[in-house]
Amino acid sequence: MSMTTLVILRFAGIFAAYTGLTVLLPAIMFRRILVGRGLSEQFLMCYTFGNFYIINIVFAVQLLHISGFWALVLFTAVPGILIWSRVNRVSLRELCIKTGIICKKILQGSMGMRGALYRVCNRIKTVLKRSVRLFYYKVICNTLQWILVGAVIIALFWIYGRNLLLTYGYCASDIPVHLNWINEMVRGNLFSDGVYPFGFHCMIYYLHTVFRVDTYAILCVFYLVQVLFIHMVLLAVMKLLCRSLYLPYAGVLVYILGNLWAKQTYSRFGASLPQEFGMIFVIPSVYFLIRFFQTEKEKLKTRETKLLSGCFALAFSLTLAIHFYGTMIAGLCCIGIAVGFCPRFLNKEYFKRIMMTGIISVFLAVLPMGIAFAGGTPLQGSLGWGLSVINGGKSDTEDSEDKTIQDITMEEMAARLNENSKNNIKSNNAKSMQTKRIPAMTETPESTFADKVREIPEKIKKHLEYDGSAYRGIYHKLAGTMVCICGTYRNCSCHSAWSDIYYPAKDYLW
């Protein structure tokens, strides 16, 4: 099997598994609620709940330290069956009794296998008839719109899908860090590097554990799954908010094909990154909030309004559970929507409900991280840095810089002492040099600016006399690392500019 065929099959399998978990499973669970709604709204509701459901299942089993294949399957199936029976008003007790009676008849011989197969075939025929009828009304009767959907998908594969075949790699330097965190989850170590939004990592971990696909292989192809759903969610929201029937397709196609923004804006779509995954749920949160404010005051207590506010809470909590940047953007969008609906936002009934929904959404996202933090897991470095900046204290970056400066100073001092030990013949000079450096290690009065200027020529002369092997080793390692990195991603469109600059250094060094 060629590498191209293998990559295509892997992508198809991961896309089918992810779509089944996040779209098909919620569609079965909430079939009665979704009946009568448009296909776009059904898709948004299913996709939002599906991701929230899977991500929090992983959080639950990880925090309980029972994570594994069977734990994930049971925690997915059992609550799913209970929700399905409750929403669709199906009595599990009666269903189990009927199934038990049929099995008993088969075992007793009062019902033959032909009779049992006849019932199963009739049930399958009924499901197939419903599927054909649904396909006719949703697809055949809207042929032109589905042709435009196909055009959007073809454009996505042309712009982003080619990189899947041309460059089999991560295409982003920070993906190995996320890979390590996911591998630690396999070992039962949630938040191995500290508390951090792990929604993206939970989804990749679920696909790896349940469907037995290597994590590194998922991260190589999952970016295209993200890109497809980003644009499908965008198209669905535009179809729901725009009065024009075909303008949403034109807008999405222009966004895909038009080179309107900086290259970095598009290149990040070529890698499986949490930030881009979290951006998906900014769009549903905007839609559900607009729909909530469009509801009349008399209908605020209806089940439909509660459903819309619940979907908004799930979507907004997903932005916070996956990446903080998505939450910032969603928050700015919510502020803009509140300004647009200012009279209703300031109304007591609307304000009370939307604030309560926002608090619940933040609580749902922070709860797993809060449990881990309360259990003794420290915050990840980026979170600690953000909190220190907010509090006005010294950031972790400054601390690390101070530590680096101290380390460099100690290395220089060690190199100088080593040089002095080699020159045993010039012991008197070595002693004088050591005595000159002793005041640098103790508290001495600060020298004036003129003294420092006069010391510069002497310091330059001393540095030129020292053996620069240690410094050359550092420079060679740094250059070799840059060559390795840029050589690895040379074929990637996201790193072509960097590789063209650094890759010729290979011939010079090696």
Residues covered by each model-derived region:
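Membrane-proximal lumenal/periplasmic loop motifs of glycosylation machinery
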Residues: 165-171, 186-201
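Membrane-embedded, hydrophobic transmembrane alpha-helices
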Residues: 1-140, 486, 490, 494-502
